[in-house]
Amino acid sequence: MTLKLGTTLYSLTNEFHGLQYTFEELVAEVARRGIGPGLEVVGFQSIRGFPVVTRQFEHDFKALIDRHELVPSCLGINADVAIRRDRQMSVDESVLYHEAQIAAAAQLGFPVVRCQFPAGPEVMRRLVPFAEKHRVKLGLEIHAPATLTSDHTLPFREMYAQVNSPFLGFVPDFGTTARAIPPTVINSYLQDGIAFDAIELALSFWGAEGEVGERMQGFEDAARSAGLSEQIVVQLSLMFVLFGRLAPEAWAEIMPQVVHIHGKFFDFDENGSEIAVDYPRVLKVFLDAGYDGYMSSEYEGHIFSDEGAFAKLEKHHALCRSLIDGHGHA
């Protein structure tokens, strides 16, 4: 067994929210285009009434994926700790909030749920017995600007070591190990009327040495000194949040606890290589380690562009398939 490919429907946010496809039609199109077999769904985005899952939806969903020969790989669940305006959720409330979503994952046949940092390590700790009972693994998504050793991540790693449960794991997001800011993002800034000099200033700090917080603060200070508006400063700062520069080889450190992967991507060059993420380098880390699980192709360009996602998903699968097939033969 080896790394298996799939798609998260989050990649198709514009197609779904723009009413170009129903949920059922999206799933069918994923299968038709050969960008499965793994299927990742974000609960609150795709399932009406979530986390309550009706028996009818359960029946229809299972029939749908069986008909199209797809496999449930991961269910994206939310922490939503600030869902109330007056206060944040208590730990007890958050545990119950997560348990309902984990139960939904089990009901629909998802073996993994994607969890978020705001849940906090204590909530994750208390969820372990429930996850073990329902046979659903908890995968904390490591997403830029966090790293494996950031203040966000270390408390979870320490708790994982204490609890030592196979149902606690991680979901690496490849945007954390980017090598460049993709053209889609640069073009979006230009279309918004941001001067290229301002974009170049942000890029110079993004590519500099140092911790992400220091580089981001350095850019913001320089941008304000240069007279850029607060709106432009905030827009350009987003590149520091979405794209990290962690070395791909660092993923090996948590490999035994990786339960799913988000194969983040944006743009391709004329040779079919992904511009922002060095896929030959990053996939080699997982293939060399013998990772046996799914990677969801995750196109996030819909934040910046209305360009259709299906063709890009096909390119991403073609790239990753070639790397998987060629592994060990170089």
Give residue ranges: language-model regions.
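Aromatic-rich peripheral "rim/lid" segments of glycoside hydrolase catalytic domains that contact
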Residues: 285, 289, 296, 300-330
